[in-house]
Design a protein with these regions (language model features):
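Cationic, low-complexity basic patches in intrinsically disordered or flexible, solvent-exposed regions
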Residues: 17-18, 29
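N-terminal capping/small domains of soluble enzymes
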Residues: 35, 39-179, 431-457
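Short glycine/threonine-rich loop-to-helix capping motif typified by GTGT followed
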Residues: 272-279, 310-322, 353-365, 460
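Charged (often Lys/Glu-rich) extended helix/loop segments that serve as interaction or gating elements
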Residues: 325-327, 331-504
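Active-site-proximal beta-alpha core segment in soluble small-molecule metabolic enzymes
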Residues: 119-300, 309
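Conserved, mostly hydrophobic/aromatic
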Residues: 95, 126, 148, 220, ...
């Protein structure tokens, strides 16, 4: 057979096979289309299906009953019916749970390596200054960290009300202006013997020498090196590694008023399993060992804060491993240098209070601005109620509160202010937001969860808000010790216009 006929034959066979394949694909697509039309209601396109297929759900703090979301077994729709939206809530039991969780992890880690020092948990007041937060936290035999002059007034108020005694550790961080120094000195002079001002700069020690009349404990903050991708090489806070030993010898060693008890170490990135973190921790420990050799009074290492909080339903962080590794490394380096292990202090703010908070909104309008962008407008502002969402692009767990049995769609969330930055358009696990489709006469509510840290202080609680958007109601939730039933109380009403326009 001529070669040309052979080529023609195989070409015709290929065309037939291609035609068959095309026909088969068309039949499959047609059948799938008919199937989808026939079984549309049975398809897994509901909001609850999306969540269950994307995450391991339900989770400890999130469950769904009758297509409505519960938070720590609290039916959120009941809160909304009682208090309305926008609404901030604080679930107090979570604060104690977090504190005791950290205590347990550090104590277990210490026991595993026969660590001789003690663990001391400090709460950072700047994370949330509210009295109900501080009172709940202090039930757990912990200590406090301050960052400004006004914090000292909080310490005095807690003492006057019997919440704390004078034996609690008060760790005073930050750059000290004259009023802060004066208040710290007054605290020490009044008998708060475990108040430890942490030296941030070399001139600070002279201010205490003038203001404090009693012997006192002090600490030194190390100016740690920043992460390589950060804008700066070295932290602006603290004293340089190379200057610490000489600073101790010239300013502290011969001054009988002061005892250097603590070396303070903090990494802005938080506690992470990275070469950068372990390298900085190792450098800190080497300085501690070198300083301990000439300063017998030194017996405490403050590793600051840095435990993250859950900001997604697929959040993953091995708290136990990191805790055990930190303690093991401290133990090993101290053993190699022949010195006793230090007492460990941590300063947890967000970890303490962050997961206790939630912020609830109503969807008040839907705006289809083009073929792709469908806006759900909330009844408040992200800039005023969750300022970290636009300030540092913080992502939170965001979930529908009701209508979990409805179909979902991709949306953008918009706030009420005129600011172009007042929006929320992505979650930590995906660059998109999905919520139930709206239906006439069926209100939609949404919640942002684990919002309990910093948002009120950064947003300016009680003050003027952007575009004069009022601060929302704030409700406190607790549980009865006898029957574990939850109860609520209104901490703050929605902000009045009188407070917004008040001038004097």
């Amino acid at each position: 057979m001529p070669i040309s006929k052979i080529i023609t034959y195989f070409a015709s066979q290929n065309k037939k096979q291609s035609a068959r394949a095309t026909l088969l694909r068309n039949l499959q697509c047609s059948s799938l289309g008919l199937y989808r039309k026939k079984h549309k209601r049975a398809m897994k396109d509901k909001y609850i299906d999306l969540i269950e297929q994307t995450f391991d759900f339900p989770q400890d703090e999130f469950t769904v009953e009758d297509n409505e979301l519960n938070f720590h077994d609290i039916p959120l729709m009941e809160l909304i019916k009682q208090y309305g939206t926008p609404l901030k809530i604080t679930y107090l039991p979570k604060i104690s749970q977090q504190i005791n969780r950290a205590k347990r992890m550090f104590n277990v880690a210490m026991a595993k390596v026969d660590y001789k020092g003690t663990y001391n948990y400090c709460y950072c007041t700047k994370s949330s200054h509210f009295s109900f937060v501080l009172e709940e936290a202090m039930k757990n035999d912990i200590h406090l960290e301050t960052s400004s002059a006004y914090d000292i007034h909080i310490i005095n108020a807690l003492y006057d009300s019997g919440v704390i005694d004078k034996d609690r550790y008060i760790i005073c961080n930050g750059f000290k202006r004259p009023q802060y120094v004066e208040n710290i000195a007054q605290l020490i002079n009044d008998g708060f013997e475990n108040t430890i001002p942490v030296i941030d700069n070399k001139e600070e020690i002279d201010l205490y020498d003038d203001a404090i009349t009693k012997k006192c404990k002090i600490g030194i903050r190390i100016a740690s090196e920043e992460e390589p991708k950060f804008e700066f090489y070295t932290s602006r806070l603290g004293i340089r590694y190379n200057d610490i030993i000489n600073f101790y010898k010239t300013k502290i060693q011969k001054n009988k008023k002061f005892k250097l008890k603590m070396l303070h170490f903090f990494i802005n990135t938080g506690i992470k399993d990275t070469a950068y973190y372990w390298n900085e921790l190792s450098k800190c420990l080497n300085i501690y060992c070198e300083l301990k050799a000439i300063c017998p009074d030194l017996d405490s290492l403050n590793i600051g804060g840095g435990f993250p909080i859950k900001n997604s339903l697929d959040f993953s962080y091995d708290y136990e491993y990191l805790t055990e590794e930190i303690i093991a490394q401290i133990k090993n380096i101290c053993t190699r240098n022949g010195i006793d292990e230090p007492h460990i202090f941590t300063e947890f703010g967000s970890f303490t209070v962050g997961e206790s908070g939630a912020t609830l909104y109503s969807i008040v309008n839907q705006k289809q601005q083009n073929d792709r962008e469908n806006w759900y407008m909330i009844d408040s502002s992200f800039i005023t109620t969750l300022p970290d969402t636009w300030g540092i692009n913080q992502r939170y767990i965001m979930l529908a509160i009701n209508n979990w049995d409805k179909e979902y769609q991709r949306v953008l969330l918009g706030g009420l202010t005129c600011d172009s930055e007042d929006f929320y358009n992505s979650e930590s696990h995906i660059n998109a937001i999905f919520l139930p489709k709206l239906e006439p006469g069926n209100p939609q509510y949404i919640g942002f969860f684990h919002t309990g840290a910093y948002q009120e202080s950064i947003g300016g609680f009680g003050g003027i808000q952007h575009c004069l958007i009022p601060a929302p109601k704030h409700v406190i939730i607790d549980r009865d010790k006898d029957d574990n039933e939850y109860y609520t109380r209104l901490f703050a009403k929605e902000q009045s216009y009188l407070s917004l326009i008040h001038i004097s």
